[in-house]
Amino acid sequence: MANNDFLFTSESVSEGHPDKVADQISDAILDAIFTQDPNARVAAETLCNTGLVVLAGEITTTANVDYIQVARDTIRRIGYDNTDYGIDYKGCAVLVAYDKQSPDIAQGVDRKSEDYLNQGAGDQGLMFGYACDETPDLMPAPIWYAHRLVQRQSELRKDGRLPWLRPDAKSQVTFRYVDGRPVEVDTVVLSTQHAPEISQSAIHEAVIEDIIKPSFPEGLITPRTKFLVNPTGRFVIGGPQGDCGLTGRKIIVDTYGGACPHGGGAFSGKDPSKVDRSAAYAARYVAKNVVAAGLARQCQVQVSYAIGVAEPINITVYTEGTGVIPDEQIAKLVREHFDLRPKGIVNMLDLLRPIYAKTAAYGHFGRAEPEFSWEATDKALELKKSA
């Protein structure tokens, strides 16, 4: 983002959004497999519609997993336990149609070598990581607060304080930037699925007072801030009944809310041999440590790969003029301190663990979950000393 005055908007969605239901099922299946077989190859795709879940993709594993039960358990945990909500975990149909990974891909990824770190990338592609000093977790403010809003909606729904809330919700936050810094919230949009008997005036008041205002620190919400709550006037039909959900349809919500480019590859349902996921996590790890080291206020990292080749084709750093040393010098430090080969990333971030279901809602980045190794800033001191 350029250093001037502008408005910038990001959105998030709740765990009950149909695309996020699909993401969470895909990652729950990945975790169930990894619990038994951490060397499995998994590309688990999910479609969910009214009363129907379809599981497809490619899985090569020695694990014995009840995929149908994993899907039902995930839907129940999200809160879809009544047909009136759009899908019911007890009665929905679950169809399973998994194949094995293509041997043509496997020969490049699993190629035996004296140096096992030379495992090839599972596909070609480009990935981005980003960090900035706008929030405590070094994330852009609009997406960070958009996540907070739908997390609070879920919290108030689950603990019964607002019992008329239902699982599906979306948020959108527009910040006003002055000299490249977020100074106030211009507009908040929050749409939440609700019980049919609750009035729109009651929804409007509760959402503003109990969800929106507590999600922001003092000073960001001003008398000028505009609130748009359920702008269509009614949101009873939601979840997979309102829209068909698909894995990988919320890649900007999953990352930085549009604050930096996206390579196009989704995360959920993919084991870490897929650089779409693992290299994007590594790029975030790199960018966050660069900012934490004080080498820049903003840092964007691009990496790219060729299928079957271990070394990244490029590692490019862009600090948008905020770096205290040249971007090329930061990129050189990155190459010296981070192993961005696919297997190097897996080892560096300890990715062969059943940790992925947590990532599938409320963002893969900017969260202080102990399993999220890519959020650590343990390399910051090394980078600072080397600079």
Curated annotation (Swiss-Prot):
Pathway assignment: Amino-acid biosynthesis; S-adenosyl-L-methionine biosynthesis; S-adenosyl-L-methionine from L-methionine: step 1/1
Region (Flexible loop): 101-111
Binding site for Mg(2+): D19
E.C. designation(s): 2.5.1.6
GO molecular function, one term: methionine adenosyltransferase activity
Protein's UniProt keywords contain Metal-binding: yes
Statement: the UniProt record of this protein carries the keyword Transferase: yes
Cofactor: binding details: Binds 2 divalent ions per subunit.
Binding site for ATP: H17, D168, A169, K170, R234, F235, D243, R249, K250, A266, K270
Keywords annotated in UniProt: ATP-binding, Cytoplasm, Magnesium, Metal-binding, Nucleotide-binding, One-carbon metabolism, Potassium, Transferase
One Pfam match: S-AdoMet_synt_C
GO biological process, any: one-carbon metabolic process
One annotated Gene Ontology cellular component of this protein: cytoplasm
PROSITE patterns: ADOMET_SYNTHASE_1, ADOMET_SYNTHASE_2
Main location: cytoplasm
Amino acids binding K(+): E45
Catalytic activity: L-methionine + ATP + H2O = S-adenosyl-L-methionine + phosphate + diphosphate
Co-factor(s): Mg(2+); K(+)
Residues reported to bind L-methionine: E58, Q101, D243, K274
Assembly mode: Homotetramer; dimer of dimers.
Family: Belongs to the AdoMet synthase family.
NCBIfam families, per the entry: metK (TIGR01034)
HAMAP family: S_AdoMet_synth1
Annotated function: Catalyzes the formation of S-adenosylmethionine (AdoMet) from methionine and ATP. The overall synthetic reaction is composed of two sequential steps, AdoMet formation and the subsequent tripolyphosphate hydrolysis which occurs prior to release of AdoMet from the enzyme.
This protein's name: S-adenosylmethionine synthase
Organism: Bordetella petrii (strain ATCC BAA-461 / DSM 12804 / CCUG 43448)
